[in-house]
Amino acid sequence: ILQNLHCQKKPWRIFDYGLAISIFRDNSTRTRFSFASAVNGLGLALAELDEVKSQIAHGETVRETANMISFLTEVIGIRDDMYPGEGHTYMLEVANAISEGYQQGILAQRPAVINLQCDLDHPTQVLSDLLKLKDYFGGWENLKGKKIAMSWAYSPSYGKPLSVPQGIINLMTRFGMNVVLAHPEGYDLLPETIQSAFSFAQESGGSFSQTTLMEEAFQNADIVYPKSWAPMSVMQQRTKLLKAGDKQGLKELELHCLAQNEKYIDWECDDEMMKLTKNGNALYEHCLPADISDVSCENGEVAKSVFEKYRLHTYQEAGYKPFVIAAMIFMSKVKEPVAKLRSFV
């Protein structure tokens, strides 16, 4: 609805004033500007917290910072995705701090906290992926029984978060889809996310399975999502080295991981791999930016020919994100959302 209103150039503001705060602890293009677009559309001004330039650098606590930035703030968006066991915990700490501030009368309103990607999940991204599937296949009811291959793919870089594949297997299994997770041995996701994917599949009537063969996952798939990620053990080791300030250890770990990735350089979504999919014409999805062979790198996640065929689809996929974020904020802030939406139309 919000996207349609935007296309019709109709406003959908719900705030007359106030701030939205973004905290990015990792690089971002799509999510950063999607958050900015969402809060602007809702009527908020945007301020980005630079932790290096704030008193956090001098030891200010999360509890104090969260309250100090929230006096006129309606929403806080956080990306903290690089370190297993850290990102989601930090978001909960911020949420608890501002809840306490609101309950004790320090804050006049309790800001919504939006997960812009953590160590466990990337909800705004995978919801955008889901909306693309809903529109592509013609409705929610048509997703049931569709096979999606969430596959690791080769990348010439290391240290990519686990949150996108974890988010995909835990969202698509809720819609009765047949989700296949493929990765080489050693590139495991967090155990709790695997366990929950099995549970969601059982509840929805779909299925969830794992394989160490990319070809098996692609066989007769309706959707493919080839993306690189770092082994869970590597991310955990990286976190320890960063906390210890061990720069030499980090360099050695990077070299080890790049060499390990090289063993699986043939894990690429190319034309031959796509021929294995249903009618050789599965929908390709990616959170972007993709590592495109002979474009952004010599060898990568996806062949140039495949990416070019689906490029506009991936852009449309990304285009849902501002409205996903806006909807999250809208639903958390509007007491009668249906009536409010009707007032916009």
What are these regions (language model features)?
Residues 25-37, 134-240, 244-248:
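Glycine-rich phosphate/diphosphate-binding loop of Rossmann-like nucleotide-binding domains
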Residues 199-303:
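Rossmann-like adenosine-cofactor binding region
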Residues 142-144, 173, 272-281, 309:
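Short, conserved loop/helix-junction motifs that constitute active-site signature segments
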Residues 104-111, 177, 276-285:
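A short helix->loop->beta-strand "cap" motif at the edges of active sites that frequently abuts
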Residues 1-13:
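An N-terminal, well-structured beta->alpha segment
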Residues 277-345:
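Adenosine-phosphate binding glycine-rich loop
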Residues 13-23, 27-134:
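Phosphate/diphosphate ligand-binding glycine-rich loop within oxidoreductases
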